């Protein structure tokens, strides 16, 4: 912000031109066009450097650019992808994380029961990756769970998308 004109060096100006969400060292910042030339990822990194801190991009690549579009960033291992079927952005969790979650159970619990819970959560997360990815992996999940004493409840792709739409208020449940 040190390069910003005096009118923009206030919290009022910051709040009027910047929307920011942050968790630990991960952040997502939307910057208005009006201030993007003097408040962007490069100037933020410079400001941090002036106070002895290092600011990195989420990939820790060291190749920072002034700004990127929503579809070019990730936040807390979630990307922002436009979904043509639903005509909106979805925030799928990194596919590697989704697939890995079924391999881990914490605590002193029934291993099969916790694995089923993880698979059900993973199946929902797969639905955020699109129909083709979902169908590919859910078929594998069903094949693996045939030997389980208890069976996971796997919805169809469309059912997961419907449930998610109700959950986030894009549809009103017929039950209400």
Residues covered by each model-derived region:
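Core nucleotidyl-transferase/polymerase catalytic module
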Residues: 1-176
């Amino acid at each position: 912000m040190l390069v910003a004109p005096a009118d923009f060096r206030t919290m009022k100006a910051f709040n009027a031109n910047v929307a920011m969400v942050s968790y630990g060292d991960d952040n997502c910042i939307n910057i208005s066009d009006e201030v993007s030339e003097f408040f962007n990822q490069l100037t933020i990194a410079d400001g941090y450097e002036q106070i002895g801190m290092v600011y990195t991009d989420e990939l820790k690549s060291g190749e920072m650019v002034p700004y990127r579009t929503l579809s070019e960033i990730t936040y807390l291992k979630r990307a922002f992808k436009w979904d043509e079927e639903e005509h909106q952005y979805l925030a799928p969790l990194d596919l590697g994380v989704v697939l890995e979650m079924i391999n881990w159970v914490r605590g002193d619990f029934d291993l099969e029961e916790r694995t089923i819970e993880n698979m059900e959560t993973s199946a929902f997360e797969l639905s955020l990756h699109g129909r083709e990815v979902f169908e590919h992996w859910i078929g594998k999940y069903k094949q693996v769970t045939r030997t389980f004493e208890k069976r996971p409840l796997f919805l169809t792709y469309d059912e997961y998308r419907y449930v998610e739409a109700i959950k986030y208020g894009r549809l009103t449940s017929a039950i209400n």
